[in-house]
Amino acid sequence: MVATFPSSIRLLEHPGTSVLERQHFISVRMPILAHDGANVPISVEMEHPMEPEHYIRSVAVYVFEDPLVTKGVFSFSPHNGRLSLSFQFRMNAGDHRVFVVAECSRHGKWATSRPVRVAVGGCHMVGAGPGALQEAPARIGPPRLWVPERIRPGEIFEVRVKATHPSRTGLRLLADGRTFVRAGLPVFLQSMEVFYGAHWFRPRLINVFTLTSVLSDDPLFIFPLRADQNGLLRIVFTNHRGQRFEVFREIRMKP
């Protein structure tokens, strides 16, 4: 699968010995064996500067053996303070290699990969063959947001936000166990935006997460944010129909 990547993307499977390689190595934590392909967790971290002149612009997750290759593209900014991300997505049954690509503002794109075996696929409707049924309807509701009660000035704190929204690919797996066909319209969250700042009428856009129909149901996102001012933290999800779901917390720093 390395040949799939353009030569401009440098693949690092180990941290390396140079400062450049250590900074751009992507640490990926996920199960080697995933029993449920509808909910595969992944955590990504990098020991990379997150300063205005040198930071990680984005992280993308791909599985080339899946019918829907792109699992998400996640933009970051220096306001995050460090590079860390956890979420959950869907994969088809079988042996796969998950690729993570990070783009540095100075040094271009870097990648790493991890092997994963999925016991039961989660990219298609329930069942196989012409008689397959769409999964039961899932509820849609407001997201939930958690931040620490006490946040110090300059602290890089953890943000947890959980959506209440289903993901349906609209694909059906045929009886041969290999062929996917379109059997319905996808249902999914299309994006997540993170705003933070003292001015409610013009808040700073910190993150834009471009999401897909292979996200897990009711996904939980965990990522960092640097506390540099008092103000509103607001997270906005938008789904495939243009519906918006918002949640917010007031950030008040305490020494």
Stretches with model-predicted labels:
Residues 58-62, 190-195, 236:
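Beta-strand signatures of extracellular beta-sandwich domains
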Residues 103-112, 238-248:
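Short acidic/polar inter-strand loop motif in beta-rich domains
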Residues 77-86, 212-222:
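Aromatic sugar-binding surface patches on proteins
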Residues 9-39, 132-157:
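N-terminal edge beta-strand
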Residues 93-97, 156, 228-232:
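Extracellular Ig-like/FN3 beta-sandwich strand-entry sites
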Residues 120-142, 254-255:
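Low-complexity, Pro/Ser/Thr- and charge-rich linker/hinge segments at domain boundaries
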Residues 29, 41-50, 158-166, 179-181:
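Short edge beta-strand/loop segments characteristic of extracellular beta-sandwich folds
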Residues 49-55, 167-173, 182-187:
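A short beta-turn/strand-edge loop motif at beta-sheet boundaries
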